Amino acid sequence: MPGLAATRWLARLEAINVILDEWEPLKLHFEMAASKERCYTAQELFDAYKDPQNRLYLLFIRKVLKEVVRVDKIFQSQNADITKITDDLLDMYRSLMQIVVDSHYLSKCTKENLPDLNFINYILPVTGNTTINFGYDFNCFAQSCPLNKEQINHVKERCKSFILELINQVKHRLPDNIKTLLMLKIFSPSNVTSQCKTSIVPIASQYRSSFPDIDELENEWKSISYIQWPQECFKDIVSFWAEVNEYTNSSGEKKFPNISALALSLLSLPFSNASIERIFSQMNVVHTDLRNRLQVRSVEALLQILMV
């Protein structure tokens, strides 16, 4: 049996994949353990593997978690493009709603308004002509398994409760400044260097206390398009804006001080706590029982060595 990822946020989907892929061997294993060793836990697990309802339920969960884990990996990445990460999050949120919400109603909502969408009256039923999308694997197994219609509908209701709770939990975790984060797309190098690009005024006006001269910001924003930037700086958005920030005119003065300061300030917004979790994980490795009396400075020094 393949080992699971030690990282806790990756283990759940992999656990479901292993259970489903090794269903029959695991079922046989626990049956033998229950009969030969008279193990109560093995008997409980064997009873769970005997029930096709559990397998049907896990097939639905696997379908749902694939997209969730994909986006979660993006947030765990240290090199994610912050201008696209909010779009990925909302795309995942919409894909979850597409499973259970009427598509005609959902299509009328723009991406930035998805967090405020009240869809409670547009939830699809589990039976009928237009139903919740339970997935191909779920439907195939439902047709071939020995469950009756009532049992299958019971599983479908469980799946419906799961997806609605997942949508609710994701909604509670969406950032309050979602519209501001969506605006960060305009700072992508491809948009910045385009002759036909989005105006900087809507986002700049929100930070007028820090950047009062909107006209100067707009002039710098338009002038960036006429500079031939080196191809090396297009590899990522941080490299690009670092290059813009260092660009000088003939007298050695920075040519884009305001727009680069605005862009770098917004691009430094935290979008994930993954780096903090990594530090705490490293601290747990460093701060063992033998090192329990280490002072804070010593722990900091060891962490800095590990993080280099």
Please state what every model-predicted region is.
Residues 1-308:
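Alpha-helical structural modules in large enzymes and assemblies
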